[in-house]
């Protein structure tokens, strides 16, 4: 790693826009339909290229939409990071899934104690936080191993898939459960309750209580309950926690019951896991605590001490670490919704303590729908950059509003979010020129460019469209690539060597 700065002419900001892909069709396209004079000028006058941000190009299954966690991991790593879903799918393909010692430990505990096995997680084929195929495999594995009682606690998705799409999957699940006498859907709740990541513990505790068999809403048929929620105008994401009256009260989650949480993505699994295990990760403690020593997470949940079924791919030398070793002073800047992504995820999925590195968190608005506040904290993030940015050599920042507003499926709100973002990018362009900064702009995955499906219905999920890479330096040319090329590109631009772990190259076209 080069220690001198003699080749570095300017300081650099990496602007990561969350959920903004590039799509030619204008229908339902919150980016194309927005008035974006700044982006228009950048695309016309500055070096830019297309970046693959989904599927096998980022370590996901073919055709799988990208997501924020995977996107930031790949941006920082300099190589394709194979994460949760790919690792688990490969274990299913090779059969090693059905030899997993952590699952077997939970099964044996259930058989030995007579307590039901409690399996919980996001029930959809979305592939961002979980996949229902993994649940189906767990059910078969448990049954073949001899587990007699099994309770399922399903979290409605409605974001990474259509907002009202769970019914056919529950019907599939019911058909499977008919083969097993004491395997039941014990509770249903929306991810809004069970998968919060913003310390909304009043909300999370409602999801937690449903695991314990404590909820205001009840059902005897899960399909009937879904229909009841739809009639109230409630989509999958916001299902009010409910419990199955056909499940014996003593069979809901209680002391010493074995638990498997089949979400592989950690960020939205940590708070609920904390309530069950009563960790030191958060101050909040459950009003109805239970104790269990057999809690299996699909992948590692940072800060949660439990059994981990599958080991993650390690990123030992991410971009931020190399920048630190070169003596650059760094800043990471984002609002709450994406703060973990510009710190934990872009640093390889670990909490790195880097010298000469500061982190600034701007609070996200605590609202039920960002469609009502499409600006989110974009203005405050830009204000903070303009206030303190000149003190740093290298800055990674994130704008969350295209993604979070895109998740609402509200086209008008998404257009507004993009227009607000465009204005903030314009402010940064002016500031960068005044303060002698260069910048690269990219995105972690698509979303805002497709807020309606072909029938005009809201689309709330991510996409497989490519994203942008824009440089403020008109003296260079960029070729197309994938997110794993971004770290080598930045290091190359700054005159620094990439680490040998980084098997992807810079996208800056060299003169022959």
From Swiss-Prot:
GO cellular component: cytosol
EC number(s) on file: 5.4.2.12
Record pathway: Carbohydrate degradation; glycolysis; pyruvate from D-glyceraldehyde 3-phosphate: step 3/5
SUPFAM superfamilies: 2,3-Bisphosphoglycerate-independent phosphoglycerate mutase, substrate-binding domain, Alkaline phosphatase-like
UniProt remark on cofactor binding: Binds 2 manganese ions per subunit.
Disulfide bonds: none
Cited InterPro entries: Alkaline_phosphatase_core_sf, BPG-indep_PGM_N, Metalloenzyme, PGAM_B_sf, Pgm_bpd_ind
Gene: gpmI
Function summary: Catalyzes the interconversion of 2-phosphoglycerate and 3-phosphoglycerate.
GO MF annotations, alphabetized: manganese ion binding; phosphoglycerate mutase activity
Name the UniProt record assigns to this protein: 2,3-bisphosphoglycerate-independent phosphoglycerate mutase
Keyword Isomerase: yes
Pfam family, one: Metalloenzyme
Biological process terms in GO annotation: glucose catabolic process; glycolytic process
Positions contributing to substrate binding: 129, 159-160, 191, 197, 265-268, 338
Keywords, ordered alphabetically: Glycolysis, Isomerase, Manganese, Metal-binding
Cofactor(s) the protein needs: Mn(2+)
Residues forming the catalytic site: 68
Binding-site positions, Mn(2+) 2: 18, 68, 444-445
Subunit structure: Monomer.
Family named by the database record: Belongs to the BPG-independent phosphoglycerate mutase family.
Metal-binding in keyword set: yes
């Amino acid at each position: 790693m080069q220690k001198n700065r003699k080749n570095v002419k300017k300081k650099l900001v990496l602007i990561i826009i969350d959920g903004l892909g590039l799509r030619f069709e204008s229908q339902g396209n919150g980016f194309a339909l927005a008035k974006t004079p700044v982006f228009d000028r950048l695309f016309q006058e500055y070096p830019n290229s297309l970046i693959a941000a989904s599927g096998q190009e980022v370590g996901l299954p073919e055709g799988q939409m990208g997501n924020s966690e995977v996107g930031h991991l790949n941006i920082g790593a300099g190589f394709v990071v194979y994460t949760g879903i790919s690792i688990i799918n490969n274990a299913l393909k090779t059969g090693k899934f059905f030899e997993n010692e952590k699952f077997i430990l939970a099964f044996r505990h259930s058989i030995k104690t007579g307590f039901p096995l409690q399996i919980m997680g996001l029930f959809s084929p979305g592939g961002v936080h979980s996949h229902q195929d993994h649940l189906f495999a767990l059910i078969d594995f448990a049954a073949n191993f001899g587990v007699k009682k099994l309770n399922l606690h399903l979290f409605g998705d409605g974001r990474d898939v259509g907002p009202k799409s769970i019914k056919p999957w529950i019907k599939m699940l019911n058909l499977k459960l008919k083969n097993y006498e004491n395997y039941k859907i014990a509770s249903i709740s929306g991810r809004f309750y069970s998968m919060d990541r913003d310390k909304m513990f009043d909300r999370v505790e409602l999801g937690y209580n449903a695991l314990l068999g404590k909820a205001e809403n009840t059902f005897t048929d899960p399909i009937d309950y879904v229909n009841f929620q739809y009639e109230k105008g409630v989509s999958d994401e916001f299902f009010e926690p409910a419990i199955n009256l056909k499940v014996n009260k003593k069979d809901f989650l209680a002391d010493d019951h074995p638990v498997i949480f089949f979400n592989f993505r950690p960020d939205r699994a940590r708070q609920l896991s904390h309530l069950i295990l009563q960790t030191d990760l958060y101050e909040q403690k459950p009003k109805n605590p239970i104790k269990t020593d057999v809690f299996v997470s699909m992948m590692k949940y940072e800060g949660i001490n439990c059994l981990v079924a599958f080991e993650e791919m390690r990123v030992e030398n991410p971009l931020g670490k190399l920048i630190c070793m070169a003596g650059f002073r760094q800043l990471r800047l984002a609002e709450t919704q994406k703060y973990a992504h510009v710190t934990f995820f872009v640093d390889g999925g670990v909490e790195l303590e880097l010298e000469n590195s500061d982190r600034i968190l701007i609070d996200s608005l605590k609202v039920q729908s960002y469609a009502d506040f499409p600006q989110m904290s974009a203005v405050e993030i830009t204000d903070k950059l303009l206030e303190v940015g000149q003190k740093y050599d290298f800055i990674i920042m994130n704008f969350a509003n295209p993604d979070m507003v895109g998740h609402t499926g509200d086209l008008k709100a998404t257009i507004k979010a993009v227009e607000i973002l465009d204005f903030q990018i314009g402010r940064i362009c002016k500031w960068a020129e005044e303060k002698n900064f260069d910048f690269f702009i990219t995105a972690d995955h698509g979303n805002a460019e497709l807020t309606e499906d072909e029938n005009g219905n809201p689309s709330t999920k991510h996409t497989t469209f490519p994203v942008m890479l824009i440089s403020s330096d008109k003296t260079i040319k960029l070729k197309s690539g994938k997110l794993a090329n971004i770290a080598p590109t930045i290091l190359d631009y700054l005159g620094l060597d990439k680490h040998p772990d980084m098997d992807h190259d810079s996208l800056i076209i060299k003169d022959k």
